Curated annotation (Swiss-Prot):
Protein name: Phosphoribosylformylglycinamidine cyclo-ligase
Location in or out of the cell: Cytoplasm
Family statement drawn from the similarity comment of this UniProt entry: Belongs to the AIR synthase family.
Enzyme Commission identifier(s): 6.3.3.1
Biological processes per GO annotation: 'de novo' IMP biosynthetic process; adenine biosynthetic process
Organism: Caldanaerobacter subterraneus subsp. tengcongensis (strain DSM 15242 / JCM 11007 / NBRC 100824 / MB4) (Thermoanaerobacter tengcongensis)
Domain of life the protein comes from: Bacteria
A cellular component term, taken from the record's GO annotations: cytosol
Amino acid sequence: MKYKDAGVNIDEGNKFVKMIKPFAEKTIKEGVLEGIGGFAALYEIKNYKNPVLVSSTDGVGTKLKIAFMMDKHDTVGIDLVAMCVNDVIVVGAKPLFFLDYFATGKLESEKAIQVIKGVAEGCEIAGCALIGGETAELPGFYKEGEYDLAGFCVGIVEKEEIIDTSSMAIGDVVIGLSSSGLHSNGYSLVRKVFFEKNNFSIEDYVPDIGKTLGEVLLTPTKIYVKSVEVLKGLKIKGMAHITGGGFIENIPRILRKGVSARIYKGSWEVPIIFDMIRRLGEIEEKEMYRTFNMGIGMVVIIDKEEVEKALKRLKEVGETAFVIGEIVEGEGGVIL
């Protein structure tokens, strides 16, 4: 008996690694000493006086189920990178490199290549190098045709440039950067609302959006690296990546003691998909703001004197941003 008889095809795995190398090589930048193929990847840090490494790990969650339903796998890799790098940049760091973990019951190279191609594309957008990963073939562990993804990002920041949330003051302004849609959170509820409660099909056309439901739900998570980069040098008091937990759980993570964030509903246009979910699922408004990003994927808290400068810089790089609130006296929560 051979390992292949138990469901693990080493030859297919080796072939897959060779096939994805060109995608990873496109992301290589200065600092990478050794990437995909070895036991470990090597990255050299240069030109920093007092560097601090910043790390984050995440997955794509049950958004993958939408990819399986559509048999479309070229964007979930972008989601994976976005979920990690967007967490790294909120402390003022720059993403350096990325590693992925791809696990499946039976490796189907053509499908898996599409996933990793998306990871590489996400890394290019974020300006970080895809330097390694793990492909795990686990017979009997996953449903046929399904897989799981996890990612790991390391960034870097000068110690004195770490965003200091303790300087947050009453009167500071909350700027919201628009999301591309649902991003990668709340999909267990989304699937229940559309496919179980209301019997929608992934192919149903949504006239108000001009796309099929599947296309809307699979829209890649926005990567905010370039947008946040242009804010460097301004008096940023804190940043929050609006992921699982929405506004209500994520913004308080960066608030100093004695303040709250007052959010002005109606100060930005909430995408249609969120209203559809609320209406069809009969979901209370507070639950929506505790589950979804509601059209705002990144929150920036900034000194009120620098708001116009920040909005101008963001507009110049094509970012859609809104003044959505302010910092007020409080007990660390979000006031809607």
